[in-house]
Amino acid sequence: MKKNNVLTIAAMIALLLTSLLTSITFGETSSIPSRISMELDKTKANIGDIIIATIRIDNINNFSGYQLNIKYDPSYLQAVNPLTGEPIKKRTMPAVNGTVLLKGDQYSITEVVENNVDEGILNFGKGYANLTEYRKSGKPETTGIIGKIGFKALKLGKTEIKFENTPVMPGAKEGTLLFDWDAETITEYNVIQPKELAITLPDDAHIALELDKTKVKVGDVIVATVKAKNMTSMAGIQVNIKYDPEVLQAIDPATGKPFTKETLLVDPELLSNREYNPLLTAVNDINSGIINYASCYVYWDSYRESGVSESTGIIGKVGFKVLKAANTTVKLEETRFTPNSIDGTLVIDWYGQQIVGYKVIQPDKITVISEPEVPTQTPTQTPPTTTAPSQTPTQTPPTTTAPSQTPTQTPAVTPTQSATPSDPGGGGGGLPGGGGGAVNPSASPTPTPTSKPTPTATKKPEPTEIEEPEPEIPGTVGIHYSYLTGYPDKMFRPEKSITRAEAAVIFAKLLGANENTKINYNVSYTDVDSSHWASWAIKFVSYKKLFTGYPDGSFKPNQNITRAEFSTVVFKLLVSEKGLKEEKIEKSKFGDTKGHWAQQFIEQLSDLGYINGYPDGTFKPNNNIKRSESVALINRAMGRGPLHGAPQVFEDVPQTHWAFKDIAEGVLNHRYKLDNEGKEQLLEIIDN
């Protein structure tokens, strides 16, 4: 009896332990509701990092398969294999390293994949095909990892990865479809979306202004260096450096030459690769103690596609010569010309977006040590000397030679502005015979002789060297009239394509025509009547034989004009206005223009330096030309601009834009002067 009691107690203890363990195990599982979730291994990443999204199911009863639709922004993220980094393509199964749906040898597995990575869509599914055998096993897979997907960070900013509904998955629950082993759709579960992802710069990313010395004396030269560190994907930068011009003089640290309005920072390491067409510019205000410098790549796409970011190195250098003993500072400072800048710095990435989230490191104050006093030498007493008897001067006979004339200073000549031509061919300036050519001085200065001096009998005078000042030579001055405009919202839209009608207006205005220009020429197109806004321009350029219609009698005014077509019009303009002749093309410069109908025009304009191709050796003749490209081409061909010293006209064309000066040349009526370097400098904006 005693033995039976012991067995009974032992059995009860075992039963209690089993119940306790079971309740603990089931308790842990049942505490998690039925769900599918996507979790990111990090919610803060740097450009180039791979974020791993883990998709898992929990407590999905009798789970046998799924179909998912995942949406992300392809400008910020690239879907990749998390193990190899290989990009995911249209038919690539994105989810790898799962722990469920692995028994293909027993139940057969079916997969379906239809990704659209250009749109940022991953649509894929997987499931057991032999559901009968799977169901008979009595061992459903309820919890585990469906798979892991990698996302490579491309661009700074905040973005999301999420399950999202799509028309191709009717009945889906937030972009998810789950199936059980009876081939039924499961509906009772939650969908857990991942948190927002922030793609940022590294924590130590910064722009710094460093001085090679801060304790100096008068006459010393301080070298200030603008540096970048870990500025990932940087494609352009503008800096505004402020100093006291009464204490410091901005100079080239190597040559000592003073900075001028347009002097660039020297010795740049970053943003200077010619393969991506670097654009460097400066708008300094030396009198106010401001160095404003910008550099950027024009070919952002090629730079971005290289995958190699210039993030750490020297932006440029400037020297400061110490003029007087006074403590001072040199620093990066805000300016109204760079709105939204960070402590006087504005950085853009290779998508053309502003980069934020970096630090700006300023230099220490400059201490100027007073010049040491130079000891005064004690003069020694001069011993008395015996006075020599003075010699009786010999009278100098009168000279008969007439002295050379001493010219007075040559007066500066004020150039006279020529009248505005009424001929339609002259309004553009820069054309032969047009309004805006060189203006000759009105008169030649005549030297005025001095009177003939009377010779002195007592002493022969020492000849005095008279410095003859060089006459001030006026630069070439003239007028250029605008040939294109912006939009009413104060935008220029430099990246926008232009239509054939818009191009017709540009060339008509370039040649001085307007809506009131009368020409004796009849032309008609089936799709351009007199009420069309550009009919006057289309008629004019057709009269000039710059444009022709199509065989069906249409002009197609709303069709975008290509790079090849625009180049052809420019070539015809040079033929008619400047007498350009066709020359035999010995060798094709571009890989994609050989045999093209516009090869002659493209190659010859390129040889003249008016147009360029792309870094890959192509011209892309059939691509639509952009507004910024068109104005630059016209200016080069017609010998106009770029216009220096122009104010910002459009909100979307800052002074750092590669075509800023060319756009200003094209949209402003202005008087100009060519400086001694041949640069066109703005004198005055003329009202329309």
UniProtKB/Swiss-Prot annotation:
Against PROSITE patterns, the record matches this protein to: SLH
State the protein's name: Cell surface glycoprotein 2
Q: SUPFAM superfamilies recorded for this chain?
A: Carbohydrate-binding domain
User: Residue span of the signal peptide, if any?
Assistant: 1-27
For bias type Low complexity, the affected ranges are 375-422
Q: Which organism is it from?
A: Acetivibrio thermocellus (strain ATCC 27405 / DSM 1237 / JCM 9322 / NBRC 103400 / NCIMB 10682 / NRRL B-4536 / VPI 7372)
Where is the protein situated, by its record's location annotation? Secreted, Cell wall, S-layer
Region annotated Disordered, chain positions: 372-477
Domain named Cohesin: residues: 36-201, 207-370
Listed GO biological process terms? polysaccharide catabolic process
Q: Which residues are in the SLH domain? A: 453-520, 521-584, 585-648, 649-669
Quaternary structure annotation from Swiss-Prot or TrEMBL:
Assembled into mono-layered crystalline arrays.
Highest lineage ranks of the organism?
A: Bacteria, Bacillati, Bacillota, Clostridia, Eubacteriales
Q: Name one GO cellular component term.
A: extracellular region
Q: Where is the composition biased (Gly residues)?
A: 424-438
**Subcellular location, principal:** secreted
- Alphabetically list the UniProt keywords: Cell wall, Repeat, S-layer, Secreted, Signal
Q: Which GO terms describe its molecular function?
A: carbohydrate binding
- Coiled coil start-end: none
Q: Which domain of life is it from?
A: Bacteria
Which Gene3D superfamilies does the record match to this protein? 2.60.40.680
